[in-house]
């Protein structure tokens, strides 16, 4: 996962892309300007233009990206953050990391126990198959 500044940079780049795409699509799909009722007869023959739908779509995308940028900015550490606050935050993160490591060790231990049981069961199955095959071979051999 990228750090917050990289995420913020990516979000700003995405916002710029959305602005460029919105301008391009709206320019391409926009109705032509009318000049003193000359274009009205031509415009009536053309199908309905989805410009309004595009405008709403791009407005929603731009608004969502702007909100994401605000959230990322709010999550950045402020200049008012003192060393004591940063140390407390770091201590809390270390505790959470320790708890997660303990949980992970427990899961790995249980996984190892299950693996041993599975390997033991597979070994028993293999032994049973070998005994069955050797018993079948000895029965199929004619006595001379």
Curated annotation (Swiss-Prot):
Subunit field text: Interacts with PPARG. Component of the Mediator complex, which is composed of MED1, MED4, MED6, MED7, MED8, MED9, MED10, MED11, MED12, MED13, MED13L, MED14, MED15, MED16, MED17, MED18, MED19, MED20, MED21, MED22, MED23, MED24, MED25, MED26, MED27, MED29, MED30, MED31, CCNC, CDK8 and CDC2L6/CDK11. The MED12, MED13, CCNC and CDK8 subunits form a distinct module termed the CDK8 module. Mediator containing the CDK8 module is less active than Mediator lacking this module in supporting transcriptional activation.
Xref: Pfam families: Med21 (PF11221)
Keyword terms, alphabetized: Activator, Nucleus, Transcription, Transcription regulation
Task: Say which domain of life the source belongs to.
Answer: Eukaryota
* GO BP, sorted A to Z: blastocyst development; positive regulation of transcription by RNA polymerase II; positive regulation of transcription elongation by RNA polymerase II; positive regulation of transcription initiation by RNA polymerase II; protein ubiquitination; regulation of transcription by RNA polymerase II; RNA polymerase II preinitiation complex assembly; somatic stem cell population maintenance
What is known about what this protein does? Component of the Mediator complex, a coactivator involved in the regulated transcription of nearly all RNA polymerase II-dependent genes. Mediator functions as a bridge to convey information from gene-specific regulatory proteins to the basal RNA polymerase II transcription machinery. Mediator is recruited to promoters by direct interactions with regulatory proteins and serves as a scaffold for the assembly of a functional preinitiation complex with RNA polymerase II and the general transcription factors.
What is the protein name stated in its UniProt record?
Mediator of RNA polymerase II transcription subunit 21
Chief location of this protein within or outside the cell: nucleus
Species, as recorded: Homo sapiens (Human)
Compartments (UniProt record): Nucleus
Similarity comment: family membership: Belongs to the Mediator complex subunit 21 family.
Q: Which GO terms describe its cellular component?
A: core mediator complex; mediator complex; nucleoplasm; nucleus; ubiquitin ligase complex
Keyword Ligase included in the entry's annotation: no
């Amino acid at each position: 996962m990228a750090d917050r500044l990289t995420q913020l940079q990516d979000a700003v780049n995405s916002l710029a892309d959305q602005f460029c795409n919105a301008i391009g699509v709206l320019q391409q799909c926009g109705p032509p300007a009318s000049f003193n009722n000359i274009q009205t007869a031509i415009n009536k023959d053309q199908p309905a233009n989805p410009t309004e739908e595009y405008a709403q779509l791009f407005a929603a995308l731009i608004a969502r990206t702007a909100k994401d940028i605000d959230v990322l900015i709010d999550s950045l550490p402020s200049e008012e953050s003192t060393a004591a606050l940063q140390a407390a935050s770091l201590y809390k993160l270390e505790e959470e990391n320790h708890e997660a490591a303990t949980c992970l060790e427990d899961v790995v231990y249980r996984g190892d126990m299950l693996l041993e049981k599975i390997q033991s069961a597979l070994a028993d199955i293999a032994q049973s198959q070998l005994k069955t095959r050797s018993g079948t071979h000895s029965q199929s051999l004619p006595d001379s």
